[in-house]
């Protein structure tokens, strides 16, 4: 032997550990991204709902005004 020992089992364990850590990091990043997206989407959803409600209220008022304007006067 020329004094070089290759620890195959150690190398495989190190690679397995490294891939495991990389996979966990990817999961953490994906989880953080999904949480951030949910945090952004929640207020946007509320705003959109409020906006639709406001439009519906305005449309109702307009229809009532138009109906009152064209209704025969007594």
Curated annotation (Swiss-Prot):
Sequence repeats lie at residues 7-16, 28-38, 39-49, 50-60. GO terms for cellular component: chlorosome envelope. Keywords: Bacteriochlorophyll, Chlorophyll, Chlorosome, Chromophore, Photosynthesis, Repeat. GO terms for biological process: photosynthesis. The modification Blocked amino end (Asn) is found at residue 2. Belongs to the CsmB/CsmF family. This is Chlorosome envelope protein B.
């Amino acid at each position: 032997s020329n004094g070089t020992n290759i620890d195959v089992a150690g190398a495989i364990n190190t690679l397995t550990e490294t891939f495991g850590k990389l996979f966990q990091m990817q999961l953490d990043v994906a989880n953080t991204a999904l949480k951030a997206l949910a945090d952004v989407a929640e207020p946007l959803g509320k705003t959109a709902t409020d906006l639709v409600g406001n439009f519906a209220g305005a449309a109702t008022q307009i229809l009532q005004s138009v109906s009152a304007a064209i209704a025969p006067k007594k």
